[in-house]
Amino acid sequence: MLKVNLKFIKKRRKELHITQAQMAIALGLSSSSGYNHYENGNRRFTANLMPMMAKILKCSIENLYT
């Protein structure tokens, strides 16, 4: 089973100078604290968010999984 690579997502977001608030808005989430729960592993990213996340982070979907 594939797992979301949370370390990669956080690292890549920071490399691109994207804030958690910006990620939340781009993904259609209600708040940056909501996004924070996903990035810290307290909530699971849903499959439908992954294509948009790959686009925002300028990477392939495969990079988002371990």
Residue ranges: model-predicted function:
Residues 1-15:
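A short, Lys/Arg-rich alpha-helix, primarily the initiator
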Residues 48-63:
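DNA major-groove recognition helix of helix-turn-helix/homeodomain DNA-binding modules
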Residues 10, 21, 51:
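Residues within the helices of the helix-turn-helix
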Residues 13, 24, 54:
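The alpha-helix within a helix-turn-helix
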